[in-house]
């Protein structure tokens, strides 16, 4: 590993030490650390035959460092939260990683790091933070201000730069779909088709009006817009509503409107009745990816999915719990014929674009023993799938040592890929030992057997440390 990633981690640790030394008398701090060693291999099918794939080794070390602080005296008015990830892949030389867009053999990602201040109903957050609503989850570097009155009425506003893979200590996890992280390699080669705007800063701003817990009812109306070099990359309006007071009737509904094309992007509605020994819920959804406006998929062919679910949970007295669920999905292939890029042929007798199925399961918890069995079947668009999943675990010595296992069986008949057909088996074993009250070590083995990739073996070693100062 180069000195870059460890140096960043040392700088973060030094900053944390200064903060601890300066405010320890009136503050509390929580330190969380995880080290992962990952050993497995992936199969590459390009330039190889299905029977003789190229094996790509993965030998990764990943370290997570989380440091949180808050005040003890004044009701946690001031605080900060942070999480840093440092990783190195010893099975991927850095020279090979540079040949692929968005691939890194070693680096550091600042997942989030922000300072928080709250007083008299106001809440301020400054730094890298995540934001979630009905349409998406994103990360941005900037400021969020929120106010909530004693009556439950409030508002929030936020502005900053969208966190993208090409940014400083950034990951591409939360950036819009449908585009590459960067064209730096193509630009260096003088490729005329390279896009320099992929790494351009993307300003983001938005706001929401809020109503919280008025006789069990909460609601919000929001707006968000992002720009790349002055052009709109994303513009959305959202509305959400919730009702619930524990047992009895509970409901949630929301919609996400794409203002750039002025059409419904996401929607969800759920009604649930919670009784003492049972619960019944019905849900309807419209789902599709959140594409960047620079993506060809956004303008050419989107694939929204409409889905309906009906579920019944039964939890009688005793250690057993049961559920049964029915699911139906309708897949849309919306091709923009106005662009004249392609034509959709409607063939009589073609495969249906819907799937139907369901699942059922039971769980058991008695003392230190826990177990669950789930069965799932779906048929229709894309073929059929039958899944059986059994998990079991036991805690020894008051949970200081735990042993968990999982067995999975799937019978798949994929209508698009003939190699995805037959029986697929998987097994996992997770052993975990508490070294101290704050530290725990774990070892995970995974084995998969199937006609597609034949055999896959994976090993993970984890060391977790959690301490309060």
Can you name each region flagged by the protein language model?
Residues 2-14:
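Bacterial N-terminal signal peptides that target proteins for export
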Residues 13-22:
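Bacterial N-terminal signal peptides
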Residues 27-469:
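Gram-negative and organellar
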């Amino acid at each position: 590993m180069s000195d870059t990633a460890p140096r960043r981690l040392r700088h973060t640790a030094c900053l944390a030490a200064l903060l601890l030394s300066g405010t320890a008398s009136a503050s509390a701090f929580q330190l969380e650390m995880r080290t992962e060693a990952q050993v497995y291999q992936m199969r590459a099918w390009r330039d190889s035959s299905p029977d003789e794939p190229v094996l790509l080794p993965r030998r990764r070390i990943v370290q997570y460092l989380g440091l949180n602080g808050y005040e003890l005296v004044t009701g946690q008015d001031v605080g900060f939260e942070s999480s840093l990830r440092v990783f190195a892949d010893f099975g991927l030389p850095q020279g090979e990683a540079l040949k692929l867009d968005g691939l890194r053999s070693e680096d550091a990602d600042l997942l989030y790091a922000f300072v928080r201040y709250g007083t008299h109903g106001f809440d301020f957050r400054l730094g890298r933070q995540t934001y979630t609503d009905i349409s998406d989850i994103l990360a941005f570097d900037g400021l969020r201000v929120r106010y909530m009155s004693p009556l439950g009425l409030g508002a929030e506003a936020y502005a900053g730069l969208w966190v993208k893979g090409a940014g400083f200590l950034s990951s591409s996890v939360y950036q819009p779909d449908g585009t590459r992280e960067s064209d730096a390699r193509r630009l260096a080669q003088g490729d005329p088709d390279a896009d320099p705007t992929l790494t351009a800063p993307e300003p983001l701003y938005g706001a929401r009006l809020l109503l919280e817990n008025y006789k069990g009812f909460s609601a919000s109306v929001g707006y968000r817009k992002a720009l790349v070099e002055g052009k709109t990359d994303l513009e959305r309006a959202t509305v959400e509503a919730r009702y619930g007071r524990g047992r009895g009737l509970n409901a949630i509904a929301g919609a996400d409107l794409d203002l750039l094309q002025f059409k419904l992007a996401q929607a969800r509605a759920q009604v649930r009745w919670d009784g003492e020994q049972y619960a019944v819920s019905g849900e309807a959804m419209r789902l599709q990816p959140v594409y960047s406006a620079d993506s060809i998929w956004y303008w050419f062919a989107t694939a929204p999915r409409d889905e309906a679910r009906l579920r019944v949970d039964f939890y009688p007295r005793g250690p057993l719990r049961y559920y049964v669920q029915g699911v139906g999905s309708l897949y849309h292939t919306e091709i923009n014929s106005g662009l004249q890029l392609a034509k959709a042929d409607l063939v009589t007798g073609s495969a249906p674009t819907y799937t139907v199925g369901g699942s059922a399961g039971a769980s058991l918890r008695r003392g230190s023993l826990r177990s669950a069995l789930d069965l799932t079947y779906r048929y229709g668009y894309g073929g059929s799938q039958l899944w059986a999943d059994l998990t079991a675990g036991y805690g020894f010595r008051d949970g200081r040592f735990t042993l968990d296992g999982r067995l999975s069986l799937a019978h798949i008949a994929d209508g698009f890929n003939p190699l995805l057909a037959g029986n697929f088996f998987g097994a996992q074993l997770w052993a975990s030992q508490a070294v101290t009250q704050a530290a725990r070590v774990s070892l995970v083995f995974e084995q998969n057997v199937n006609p597609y990739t034949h055999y896959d073996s994976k090993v993970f070693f984890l060391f977790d440390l959690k301490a309060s100062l």
